[in-house]
């Protein structure tokens, strides 16, 4: 009989990506939930409508991906995003942009946001973000 234990340790186990949806607009949070449900292999672990709720949930829960509305983030809050990324290096952050400009994307990168997603392009752009995060999660689990 062949011992498969060594082989199985090399294969990454797949588990759903745990997502926190943070947007001031409840209707848009529901839209994101529907998109994520269609995409599959992820679970919405929580929702937040304020930055205080975001910080509370990401520090108390095991979240893989934070979908964060840029309008919730002031210039001071961008510094908080950077600090959060330093405290929780495994957390991936996708900033949801109402106004998708190169300047916004550059600011997101500068403050340690991993992805920028245009709100009006969420259905087209979110699958690539989830695929990237799934690869990271699979690597951690393996």
Please annotate each region the language model reported.
Residues 59-61, 84-91, 111:
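Conserved phosphotransfer cores of two-component systems
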Residues 67-84:
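Conserved phosphotransfer microenvironments
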Residues 47-65:
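Acidic, metal-coordinating helix/loop segments flanking the phosphotransfer/catalytic sites
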Residues 26-46:
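Two-component/phosphorelay signaling modules centered on CheY-like receiver
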Residues 79, 99-117, 121:
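Alpha4 helix (beta4-alpha4-beta5 surface) of REC/receiver domains from two-component response regulators
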Residues 66, 93, 116-117:
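Two-component signal transduction core modules
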């Amino acid at each position: 009989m062949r011992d498969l234990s060594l082989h199985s340790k090399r294969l990454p186990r797949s588990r759903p990506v745990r997502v926190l949806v943070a947007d001031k607009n409840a209707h848009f949070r529901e839209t994101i939930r529907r998109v994520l449900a269609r995409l599959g292999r992820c679970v919405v672990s929580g929702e937040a409508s304020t930055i205080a709720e975001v910080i509370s949930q990401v520090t108390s829960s095991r979240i893989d991906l934070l979908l964060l509305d840029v309008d919730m983030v002031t210039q001071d809050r961008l510094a908080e995003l950077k600090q959060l990324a330093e405290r929780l290096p495994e957390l991936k952050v996708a900033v949801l942009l109402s106004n998708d400009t190169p300047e916004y994307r550059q600011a997101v990168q500068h403050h340690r946001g991993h992805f920028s997603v245009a709100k009006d392009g969420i259905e087209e752009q979110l699958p690539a973000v989830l695929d990237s995060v799934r690869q990271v999660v699979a690597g951690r689990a393996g």
